């Protein structure tokens, strides 16, 4: 898949399955979440992954609100803390959560830092990269006028490689 190319819609239609949104299909072994920050909202998705790179969209939410204010970030924190019901009846939490830091960067860093959870990662999209998820870059951010001794790490995420992997 070339950069800027969309996958063949017919291939995607042929891959569809019938399952209830918000539940994890039987083949789903682990859940990952990701969120994209915009000025007036955060769009968050939860995906289940199974054997052979099989994946299912479990849920997609649009959390409306000014991303310069705490309310929408609190909604994202609540979503991140949830678990989803597997077809077996088991409750599955997120194994990993990635937050795009390309917009509202400082607010996104603050969110990741406040989670105090190594499963939550800051990511920055790049057009090209050697790997889907690159080596993390340590950042040192000032917050409230104080220099942080240990900044969070930001991982690069290569969109072109993601298309090759998943389509």
Task: Please annotate each region the language model reported.
Residues 1-8, 23, 52-167:
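Mg2+-dependent endonuclease catalytic cores in nucleic-acid-processing enzymes, primarily RNase H-like
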Residues 33-58:
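Acidic, metal-ligating active-site segments
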């Amino acid at each position: 898949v070339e950069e800027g190319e969309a996958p063949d819609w017919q291939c995607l239609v042929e891959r569809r399955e019938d399952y209830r949104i918000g539940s994890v299909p039987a083949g789903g072994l682990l859940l990952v979440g990701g969120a994209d920050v915009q000025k007036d909202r955060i769009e968050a998705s939860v995906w289940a992954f199974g054997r052979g790179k099989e994946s299912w969209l479990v849920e997609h939410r649009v959390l409306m609100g000014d991303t310069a204010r705490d309310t929408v970030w609190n909604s994202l924190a609540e979503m991140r803390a949830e678990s989803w019901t597997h077809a077996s009846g088991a409750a599955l939490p997120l194994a990993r959560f990635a937050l795009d830091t390309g917009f509202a960067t400082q607010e996104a860093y603050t969110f990741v830092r406040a989670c105090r959870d190594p499963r939550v990662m800051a990511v920055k999209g790049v057009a090209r990269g050697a790997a889907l998820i690159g080596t993390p870059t340590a950042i040192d951010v000032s917050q409230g006028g104080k220099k942080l001794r240990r900044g969070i790490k930001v991982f690069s995420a290569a969109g072109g490689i993601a298309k090759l992997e998943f389509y």
